[in-house]
From Swiss-Prot:
Organism: Nanoarchaeum equitans (strain Kin4-M)
GO molecular function, one term: structural constituent of ribosome
Protein name: Large ribosomal subunit protein uL2
Pfam families membership: Ribosomal_L2 (PF00181), Ribosomal_L2_C (PF03947)
InterPro entries per UniProt: NA-bd_OB-fold, Rib_uL2_dom2, Ribosomal_uL2, Ribosomal_uL2_arc_euk, Ribosomal_uL2_C, Ribosomal_uL2_dom3, Ribosomal_uL2_RNA-bd_dom, Translation_prot_SH3-like_sf
Length: 238
């Protein structure tokens, strides 16, 4: 019989067990690109899938296109959203950063103009437009970090809905199990000392304490590299 590989070895192989199930997504969530300074759209649906933490809004534009975007707080089905330089400064409007007033809460920021929005996409998140400096704009991200972006990069005005998601506890292990299964998360996480000797270097019941030191060389083979890898020191600092 073959040896049972460690969890870190199995995860590193990248089997479907550990991959994000992107095929369960409702669609591609990105800022669309249209010609013209003002394009109107209508929110036709609010949906939720197992991939994105934030609720999504389905927008039907007047040119016939349809897009999927994180829903801002306060939006509802039937509301009108706008796209372009001449769009009003209303919730859900998509505008270049150069056309958005300073101090506005925004989300779905483009890291590079035209990339569709790569920053600030999680539920409850928003960034602040702090200052405009010619062709550059300074924004404050949810982490507190200040980032300089191109003034031609686009963003959506508002705060992403679903900010209280973490306030509701799982309560039962079954709820946590189904949540983890929907995202291919490995759960529950078991301590190596509690495992069998064949499953982990620290496992087994022959000794009351672990039979190997927690510190391990960074040159150790993959099946042994668990614990404090290449640690210079352990424990509390004096």
């Amino acid at each position: 019989m073959g040896k049972v590989r460690l969890l870190v070895q199995r995860r590193g192989r990248g089997s479907p067990t550990f991959r994000s199930p992107t095929h369960r997504a409702a669609g591609k969530v990105k800022i669309p690109t249209f010609d013209g300074d003002l394009v109107k759209g209508k929110v036709v649906a609010l949906i939720k899938d197992s991939i994105h933490y934030a609720p999504l809004m389905v927008v039907k534009w007047e040119n016939g296109a349809q897009s999927l975007l994180p829903a801002p707080l306060g939006i509802s089905v039937g509301d009108t959203v706008y796209y372009g330089k001449e769009a009003p400064n209303a919730i859900g409007s998509i505008k270049p950063l150069s056309e958005i007033p300073e101090g506005t809460k925004i989300y779905m920021l483009e890291n590079n103009p035209g990339d569709g929005g790569k920053l600030v996409r999680a539920s409850g998140d928003f960034a602040l437009l702090v200052q405009k400096l010619g062709d550059k704009v300074i924004v404050q991200l949810p982490s507190g970090q200040f980032k300089t972006l191109s003034a031609n990069a686009r963003a959506v005005i508002g705060v992403i809905a679903g900010g209280g998601r973490k306030e509701k506890p799982f309560v039962k292990a079954g709820n946590k199990y189904y949540w983890a299964s929907s995202r291919n998360r490995h759960w529950p996480v078991v301590n190596g000392v509690k495992k069998n000797a064949s499953d982990h270097p620290f496992g087994g019941k022959r000794h009351s304490n672990h039979s190997k030191p927690f510190t391990v060389s960074k040159w150790a083979p993959p099946g042994r590299k668990v614990g404090y890898i290449g640690a210079r020191k352990t424990g509390r600092g004096k």
